[in-house]
C-alpha cells in the first residue's frame, strides 16, 4: 500500500514554539484564538498532553481555527503554501489588555507576526516581560519595525533581516552591518538564520557565525520554531549568546529529522547531546 502524501498535524508558529518549549521542560502558557471545530479540539488535546496552559486563549464560536497548508518538495523544503488565519484578527489590543497582568508576570513572552500590526504594537508598548519575536515571513516582518527597540530577541532569516535593517546582505561584512543596525534599534540579541549557512548570533558584546550541525534531513518545516524555542529556553537558563545559538542549532537539527513539524524526541538532553 502506498503511503498517503497528505499529513495533517497540529501546528502554527506560536503553538509550535510553545510545544517545543514544553518538550524542553519549560512551563508554558499559550494565548491564541480557537474556533469551535475539530482543529481546536486537536490543539486542546495536544496542549493538554504537554501541560501547555490554554486557559487565557480566546474562543471564537463562529470562527475557524487557523489552518496552514504547505506542499513539500523531494528535499523536504516548502514548495507552496497557503493559509487561513483570519481568526487571529480577534486577538485585538482590547483583548490583549485583559491579559496584560498575565503577560507581564511571565519570564518571557514570545510573539509572532500572525498577530495584527496593531496588536503587535500594543504588546511592544505595554508588555514589560522580555519580548522575543519571530517575523514568520518577509511579508509580515514589517509589523515588527515599530517595536524593534522594545524587543529583547529577534530571529529573522536573511530576507527578513534585510527588510528590518535596510541593509542588503551580500557578504559577511554586510551581514554584520545588518546585525549592528538591528542591535542599534534596541534589540539585546539577534539570531539571523542563514539556511544552509547556519546562523549569525549577535548581541552588544560580540557576533559569532555558527554552522549547522549534522542532521538527516526529513522535513525542514518547524526547524525555525525549534530554534526559537531553544533560544528562549536558553534565556530562561541564563545562557550566554554562543550557548543559546548552539542550542538553537541543535534543536533545529533535531526537528529536521522528523516527518512531523515537532520531533517528539526533542528534549534538553537531546539538545545537549547534539551539541557535543
Language-model regions, residue ranges each:
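Aromatic/hydrophobic pocket-lining residues that form π-stacking "cages" and hydrophobic walls in ligand
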Residues: 17, 43, 120-123, 251
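Ribokinase/PfkB-type carbohydrate-kinase core domain
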Residues: 45-59, 70-206, 267-270
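Conserved phosphate-binding/catalytic region of the ribokinase-like
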Residues: 140-141, 145, 172-276
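Short alpha-helix plus adjacent loop in nuclease-associated cores
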Residues: 65-68
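Glycine-rich phosphate/adenosyl-contacting loop at the front of the ribokinase-like
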Residues: 1-33, 38-49, 211, 216-217
Amino acid at each position: 500500500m502506498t503511503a498517503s502524501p497528505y499529513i495533517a498535524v497540529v501546528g502554527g508558529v506560536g503553538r509550535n514554539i510553545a510545544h517545543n518549549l514544553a518538550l524542553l521542560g519549560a512551563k508554558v502558557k499559550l494565548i491564541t484564538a480557537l474556533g469551535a471545530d475539530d482543529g481546536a479540539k486537536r490543539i486542546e488535546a495536544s496542549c493538554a498532553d504537554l501541560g501547555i496552559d490554554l486557559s487565557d486563549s480566546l474562543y471564537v464560536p463562529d470562527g475557524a481555527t487557523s489552518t496552514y497548508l504547505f506542499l513539500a518538495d523531494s528535499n523536504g523544503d516548502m514548495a507552496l503554501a497557503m493559509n487561513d488565519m483570519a481568526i487571529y484578527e480577534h486577538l485585538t489590543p482590547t483583548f490583549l489588555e485583559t491579559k496584560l497582568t498575565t503577560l507581564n508576570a511571565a519570564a518571557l513572552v514570545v510573539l509572532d507576526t500572525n498577530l495584527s500590526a496593531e496588536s503587535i504594537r500594543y504588546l511592544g508598548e505595554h508588555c514589560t516581560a522580555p519580548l522575543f519575536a519571530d517575523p514568520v515571513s518577509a511579508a509580515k516582518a514589517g509589523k515588527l519595525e515599530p517595536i524593534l527597540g522594545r524587543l529583547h530577541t529577534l530571529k529573522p532569516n536573511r530576507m527578513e533581516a534585510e527588510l528590518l535593517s535596510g541593509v542588503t546582505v551580500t557578504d559577511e561584512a554586510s551581514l554584520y552591518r545588518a546585525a549592528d543596525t538591528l542591535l542599534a534599534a534596541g534589540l539585546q540579541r539577534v539570531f539571523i538564520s542563514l539556511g544552509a549557512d547556519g546562523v549569525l548570533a549577535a548581541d552588544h558584546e560580540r557576533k559569532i557565525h555558527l554552522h549547522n550541525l549534522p542532521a538527516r534531513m526529513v522535513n525542514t518545516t518547524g526547524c525555525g520554531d525549534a530554534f526559537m524555542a531553544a533560544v528562549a529556553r536558553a534565556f530562561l537558563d541564563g545562557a550566554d549568546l554562543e550557548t543559546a545559538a548552539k542550542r538553537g542549532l541543535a534543536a533545529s537539527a533535531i526537528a529536521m529529522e522528523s516527518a512531523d513539524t515537532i520531533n517528539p524526541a526533542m528534549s534538553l538532553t537531546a539538545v545537549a547531546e547534539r551539541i557535543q
